Design a protein with these regions (language model features):
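Short linear motifs centered on Gly/Pro in flexible linkers and helix caps
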Residues: 5-7, 192
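Intrinsically disordered, low-complexity segments enriched in small/polar residues
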Residues: 8-9, 20
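Aromatic-rich, lipid-facing transmembrane alpha helices and their immediate juxtamembrane interface loops
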Residues: 21-264
Length: 264
């Protein structure tokens, strides 16, 4: 039993030389876990407001639950904030001039987020046959996944984070990470999050099978819009949560109707 405990301690600490280093490692992990949660939630709110008031794809100005998950979080923003948080700690003092130093740092952050956005979009297109967003109408876009316009937005958001959020988030997160109840809070969030991921991936698997059988890439937002049209046709209530679910027909029949409308 003692030997098993030692082995578990070894792997948890990832070869830490002392208990203090192990504690530091776990604290950093909790900080990143919390930042992922904050980024996912903040990104969801940002997308919610953008789609409601500014998106050309929503002329009726309805509230639309963004992303493919049910809950109020977007993992893309969570991963992006973790990367931006880590980049905010790098030493760029070798660059002369304060303004140039910050410009290079923010550009590095923006390009990093753009790369995350690109690979995330590519994974869904190649792996799931689903396109979650489409920048095809934007100038100089690459495969409709990324474009200079949104890279510029990431640059602005990186600057806002660095000057307004990062100085305060360091103290608050370190305080939270030092409290035991915080670990429970993080665990609760990830428990709900993983259940949501499982439910949403089941929907995506159905979409993937249909898309592969018909050799198409399903435009997720167009399909969501089609679901809304079917909901109106069947006189069902609009759903902000579980927006891909219909009471009268299955997801497979919804996909068939979507295919007949947009691809035939």
């Amino acid at each position: 039993m003692f030997a098993q405990t030692r082995i578990i301690h070894y792997y948890v600490c990832l070869g830490a030389a002392s208990g203090k280093e192990c504690k530091v490692f776990m604290k950093e992990w909790l900080i990143l876990a919390f930042i992922f949660f904050i980024g996912s939630l903040a990104g969801w709110l940002l997308e919610l407001i953008f789609r409601r008031f500014f998106s050309k794809a929503n002329p009726s100005r309805k509230w639309i639950n963004p992303g493919f998950l049910v809950g109020p979080y977007l993992p893309l923003y969570g991963f992006s904030l973790c990367v931006v948080y880590l980049l905010a700690h790098i030493n760029v003092s070798f660059i002369h001039g304060v303004y140039l130093r910050k410009t290079v740092l923010f550009l590095l952050m923006a390009l990093s987020v753009t790369l995350i956005e690109y690979f995330a979009g590519l994974i869904f297109i190649k792996g799931m046959h689903v396109k979650l967003w489409d920048y095809s109408d934007e100038k100089f876009n690459i495969q409709g996944i990324i474009c200079p316009k949104f890279t510029f937005f990431w640059y602005l958001l990186s600057a806002i984070y660095y000057f307004l959020i990062h100085p305060n988030i360091i103290h608050s997160i370190e305080w939270l990470a030092g409290n035991l109840w915080f670990s429970f809070f993080v665990g609760l969030f990830y428990g709900v999050f993983l259940i949501d991921v499982g439910y949403s991936l089941n929907i995506l698997n159905n979409i993937q099978k249909f898309a592969k059988e018909n050799d198409i890439i399903v435009q997720y937002e167009a399909f969501r819009k089609h679901i809304g049209e079917l909901r109106n046709e069947f006189k069902e209530k609009e759903r902000f949560v579980f927006s891909m679910k219909l009471d009268h027909i299955s997801i497979k029949k919804s996909l068939k109707a979507y295919f007949d409308k947009y691809y035939k």
